[in-house]
Amino acid sequence: MKETFTLVATAAAGLEAVVGRELRELGYDTQVENGKVRFQGGVRAIAETNLWLRAADRIKIVVGEFPARTFEELFQGVFALDWENYLPLGAKFPISKAKCVKSKLHNEPSVQAISKKAVVKKLQKYFHRPEGVPLQETGAEFKIEVSILKDKATVLIDTTGASLFKRGYRTDKGGAPIKENMAAAILELSNWYPDKPLIDPTCGFRVIIMTQANSQVNTRVLELLPKFKIKKMNRWCAV
């Protein structure tokens, strides 16, 4: 298993700087991009950022990047990645999402199917399994995503599961409550300090107030998110 990964913390448009600041406060060097912030870290970093980032949506591992102008290039690119360092024998690995933007490859279901085939072939080769015998996917789930932008494919593994905004205390919600990570970003951008009054003009479900209260007592999202994905990934749960 690899000791260091390239990771991305995804964020809503316009909130990348807030997520980058949170990462730097945790001690990581960052590279801010559209909709995400890149950083390097090991297994501990995956757990730590899933636990403590408040404005991010998800934490994903970048498995690899390569040109993909044809389905053959896509297959060979996915096949060439070192999947044995990410997926244990028996793991479930659905290609949960494919996105193609401004690229020659645009049929997203086909991208998913080709990518799945490539991962299966690679694991069959590594674990010495016959090609005609399907892999048993009965273990922990590792959701794989393939994004192709301007003919460049990026392959990722989602480590979060349920989006981090679902860390809330609510058992019910109204028509359009603000997401907890958006509330956290608003509070960060407002430069509010604990010695000042905090007023939530929308009130409603008191998301902004409760988000700040959770922050003040350093409530970990793991305690509020019982379906936290990393708890189910046996290969990483020792962290």
Report residues per predicted region.
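Generic beta-strand structural signal
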Residues: 32, 148, 229-231
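SAM-dependent Rossmann-like transferase core, predominantly class I methyltransferases
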Residues: 155-189
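C-terminal edge-of-domain segments
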Residues: 144-157
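Conserved S-adenosyl-L-methionine
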Residues: 178-239
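Non-catalytic nucleic-acid substrate-recognition regions in nucleic-acid-modifying enzymes
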Residues: 2-140
